[in-house]
From Swiss-Prot:
Residues 87-114 have a biased composition (Low complexity). InterPro entries: A-crystallin/Hsp20_dom, HSP20-like_chaperone, Small_HSP. Belongs to the small heat shock protein (HSP20) family. Gene3D superfamilies: 2.60.40.790. GO terms for molecular function: unfolded protein binding. Residues 80-122 are annotated as: Disordered. One of its GO terms (biological process) is response to salt stress. It comes from Dictyostelium discoideum. The keyword Lipoprotein does not apply. This is Small heat shock protein hspK.
């Protein structure tokens, strides 16, 4: 059986692993649970500017903060808040019972999977990502942070970082006469 490579599926797998890693790291250092997630990001670098686009569906502008630190680092933070008690839904790792039998004569395996009956008026799992996020990017040397622009439209946050005009390695200085 041949399986085609799906970059979106692979990105989601990596995203999920990173979220689990972040959650374990933070949970082990504190007594309370903090949801941290990493929004999908697209970075484009061209001659005149760098464009960073975040996919932030369900987050308003006032739930996002964009700052530049003294170390010339762009820091983007925000929080996607729950609506209607989404924090209390069971996670996607709900218990599922599985029985497997193998027929050695034909080398086939039959697996029967049964899920526990769902409670009335309850959803089976929470697939909506909520919680806080933080992303940071080291800006190129010579970046004028006052010229950085950010816009948000239809759940997409776009940050435009203008590049400093490239200077030549050597600058020719003309010699003028005193007259």
């Amino acid at each position: 059986m041949t399986m085609e490579f799906d970059p979106r599926r692979e990105r989601r797998k990596v995203q999920k692993k990173m979220n689990v890693f972040d959650h374990r790291l933070i949970s082990s250092n504190s007594n309370h649970r903090i949801n941290i997630w990493r929004p999908t990001v697209s970075i484009k670098d061209n001659k005149t500017h760098i464009s960073i686009i975040f996919e932030l569906a369900g987050i308003s502008r006032d739930q996002i903060s964009i700052e530049v630190t003294k170390e010339n680092t762009l820091v983007i933070t925000g929080e996607k808040k729950s609506k209607g008690g989404l924090n209390n839904l069971p996670s996607s790792s709900s218990s599922i019972n599985s029985d497997s039998t193998t027929n050695t004569n034909t080398n086939t395996t039959t697996t029967t999977t049964t899920a526990p009956p769902p409670p009335s008026d309850a959803q089976l799992k929470n697939i909506i990502t909520i919680g806080k996020f933080i992303r940071s990017y080291k800006l190129p040397p010579g970046t004028d942070s006052s010229k950085i622009k950010a816009t948000m439209d239809d759940g997409l946050l776009e940050i435009i970082i203008p590049k400093d005009t490239p200077s030549e390695d050597r600058l020719k200085i003309p010699i003028q006469s005193k007259l």
